[in-house]
Design a protein with these regions (language model features):
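Nucleotide-activated donor-binding/catalytic signature segment of Leloir-type glycosyltransferases, i.e.
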Residues: 259-278
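N-terminal subdomain of nucleotide-sugar transferases
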Residues: 1-59
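Conserved acidic donor-binding segment of nucleotide-sugar-dependent glycosyltransferases
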Residues: 327-338, 345-351
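Conserved donor-binding/catalytic core segment of Leloir-type glycosyltransferases
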Residues: 4, 202-224, 230-234, 247
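Short hydrophobic beta-strand element within catalytic cores of glycosyltransferases
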Residues: 312-315
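Donor nucleotide-sugar binding/catalytic pocket of nucleotide-sugar-dependent glycosyltransferases
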Residues: 40, 156-198, 212-215
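Aromatic "clamp/platform" in nucleotide-sugar-dependent glycosyltransferases that forms part
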Residues: 295
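Short alpha-helical donor nucleotide-sugar binding micro-motif in glycosyltransferases
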Residues: 274-275, 282-287
Length: 382
């Protein structure tokens, strides 16, 4: 099937990790045997009135990719002004794609703005439109009068909606209850098995090693709660009279604050900053557990990546995380210090089958599995 894969989130040379999970879906579709062209329309804030750049290439997986970069100090206005973006989209499609590629389907990623624009383009081409949904901010978008109607219409007119978790599916259905159940197919994110793989854990060391991976930044509405596991680990260390080491991976403006808290609690914490996936995998192999305290998750890629290495996870019982973590591969915690202490102690006292943990997650989220699940959705539209 010829698939025009449209997105407003996609990695670039300047932002190599922006929307990388969207790119992994594109690769999964390509590996499933579909003829896919990626069209990424990105709007960024820069100190210029208006600038547009078009880059065309085949990426490392052989996927034909057209990236349109719009730069302007009016970014926020242009990002929400859908008719303007649609004019650009149609122009780029006609000039750079239409001559030698006729799509059978448009596959958009995230309902706003890509899903709404994809809906309009699919209507003009008279072909089906499907949406993969990653977005946790749909409720806020539906409160915006200028775009809420377009979002509801895009969902309603789509041939299929593929949220990355049951949690996100339920959230969409609660916000727009008129959407029929048959429209939904849950398709998770890809976890790259060539990077994240099982390796036998080293046992009998004199310390228990924990790892945490996120961007540690201040936000108006906090989504990560590192102080929970820092304090809980410090308390468990004293209660059990054991050595604990915490490795914190990721950048952000909270690093100094968290370092001070760790020292204050007498917790041996090492802050590594931003690391590539290969280094993260190596650290996960050397750690006994991943800790992940958050207020919500639409999927939890970092958690799935840890499980893919066979590393048990201690995490918050929020969002989609209960779909990934259970008593066979970790512990789910209520977000308070006492329950986190109980969860950490319970995990330390549990003997996990690390190989089985890795195999089960690989079976659910490999490129092959996700590619086949998306193909099943496409096949229903023929």
């Amino acid at each position: 099937m010829n698939v025009l894969f449209f997105t407003s989130w996609y990695p670039t040379l300047l932002q190599p990790h922006f929307g990388v999970f969207v790119k992994e879906h594109a690769h999964a579709i390509h590996l499933a045997g579909h003829n896919i062209v990626v069209l990424a329309l990105l709007v960024s804030k820069k100190k210029c009135l208006f600038q547009i750049k078009v880059e065309k290439n085949k990426d490392e997986a052989g996927v034909r990719t057209v990236v349109v970069q719009i730069n302007s100090f009016l970014r926020d206005y242009l990002y929400h002004f859908l008719p303007f973006q649609y004019l650009i989209l149609k122009h780029i499609y006609r000039k750079h794609i239409a001559a030698d590629f006729k799509p059978d389907i448009i596959h958009s990623n995230v309902v706003f703005p890509a899903g709404t624009l994809g809906d309009w383009l699919a209507k003009s081409l008279n072909i089906p439109h499907v949406i993969t949904e990653h977005w946790s901010r749909i409720k806020g978008a539906l409160d915006m009068p200028f775009i809420s109607g377009a979002i509801i219409k895009a969902y309603s007119k789509s041939a299929a909606i593929m949220p990355v978790s049951h949690f996100l599916k339920n959230s969409i259905q609660s916000l727009i209850p008129d959407l029929p159940e048959k429209k939904f197919s849950v398709v998770g994110n890809v976890v790259k098995t060539d990077l994240f793989h099982y390796k036998e854990k080293i046992v009998g060391t004199d310390e228990i090693r924990f790892c945490a991976i996120a961007t540690w930044s201040h936000k108006k509405i906090p989504d990560k709660l590192p102080e929970l596991f820092i304090e809980a680990l410090a308390n468990v260390q004293k209660k059990m009279n054991i050595k604990v080491k915490l490795i914190m991976i990721g950048g952000g403006d909270r690093l100094d604050e968290l370092s001070v808290l760790s020292k204050l609690k007498d917790l041996n914490a090492e802050f590594r900053g931003f690391l590539g996936k290969e280094e993260i995998c190596s650290i996960l192999h050397s750690c006994d557990f991943l800790v992940h305290a958050s207020t919500t998750e639409t999927f939890g890629v970092g958690v799935a990546e840890a499980l893919m290495t066979g590393t048990p996870v201690i995490c918050s019982a929020v969002g989609a995380l209960p779909e990934l973590v259970n008593e066979s591969n970790g512990v789910l915690c209520v977000n308070n210090i006492e329950n986190w202490e109980e969860g950490i102690i319970g995990a330390i006292n549990t003997k996990y089958n690390h190989r089985i943990i890795a195999e089960e997650v690989k079976a659910r989220f490999s490129q092959h599995t996700i590619g086949q699940q998306i193909t099943q959705v496409y096949d229903k539209l023929k």
